[in-house]
C-alpha cells in the first residue's frame, strides 16, 4: 500500500465491534533497531486505533525468519502482520532474503486463509527505511499501513467464515 494511487483505509470506518474482537499477531525482525522501533510503534498504534487492546508481539532475528513465525501463529489469529527491513549490500544476499520473505509470507496467507500484512521494507539505503518507518520526519508509516491492511482484510473475510 504505497506510492501513487494507494487506497485510503480509515480504521474508524470499520465496524468497531468487529475490529476490536480480532486477534492480531505482529511478528517483527530485529535488524536495524531504529527503523524497526518505528515500524513496531506504528503497528501498535494502528492496533490501538482499531480497538485491539493487546496484540501479540513476537520478535525474531531477521526478515528471513518472518515466514516461519507467521506460519506458526496464523492458525491462532485473525490477522498477522510481518515487519522487517532489508537494506541492500554488496552481495546478492539482499535479493535472496527479500524473495524468501515475500514468497514465504504470501504462501502463509494463501495457505492458511489468514491475512498477512506485509510490512517488510526492502531498501537500497538506510535513509529509505527511515523515511518509511513512521519516525519523526518520516514520509510514510509502513507499520501502521500493514496493520491497517491486514485488519481491513480480516474484517472483510469474516463475512465468509
UniProtKB/Swiss-Prot annotation:
Pathway: Cofactor biosynthesis; riboflavin biosynthesis; riboflavin from 2-hydroxy-3-oxobutyl phosphate and 5-amino-6-(D-ribitylamino)uracil: step 1/2. Keywords: Riboflavin biosynthesis, Transferase. The lineage of its organism: Bacteria, Bacillati, Actinomycetota, Actinomycetes, Micrococcales. This is 6,7-dimethyl-8-ribityllumazine synthase. One of its GO terms (cellular component) is riboflavin synthase complex. The active site is at residue 93. It comes from the Bacteria. NCBIfam families: lumazine-synth (TIGR00114). InterPro entries: LS, LS/RS, LS/RS_sf. (2S)-2-hydroxy-3-oxobutyl phosphate binds at residues 90-91, 132. Its EC number is 2.5.1.78.
Amino acid at each position: 500500500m504505497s506510492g501513487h494511487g494507494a487506497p485510503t483505509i480509515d480504521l474508524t470506518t470499520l465496524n468497531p465491534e468487529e475490529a476490536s474482537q480480532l486477534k492480531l499477531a505482529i511478528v517483527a525482525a530485529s535488524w536495524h533497531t531504529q527503523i524497526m522501533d518505528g515500524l513496531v510503534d506504528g503497528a501498535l498504534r494502528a492496533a490501538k486505533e482499531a480497538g485491539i487492546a493487546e496484540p501479540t508481539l513476537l520478535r525474531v532475528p531477521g526478515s528471513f525468519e518472518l515466514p516461519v513465525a507467521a506460519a506458526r501463529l496464523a492458525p491462532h489469529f485473525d490477522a498477522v502482520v510481518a515487519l522487517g527491513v532489508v537494506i541492500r549490500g554488496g552481495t546478492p544476499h539482499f535479493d535472496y532474503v527479500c524473495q524468501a520473505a515475500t514468497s514465504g509470507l504470501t504462501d502463509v496467507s494463501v495457505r492458511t486463509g489468514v491475512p498477512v500484512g506485509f510490512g517488510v521494507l526492502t531498501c537500497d539505503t538506510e535513509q529509505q527505511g527511515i523515511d518509511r518507518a513512521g519516525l519523526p520526519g518520516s514520509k510514510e508509516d509502513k507499520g501502521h499501513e500493514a496493520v491497517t491492511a491486514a485488519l481491513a482484510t480480516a474484517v472483510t473475510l469474516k463475512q465468509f467464515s
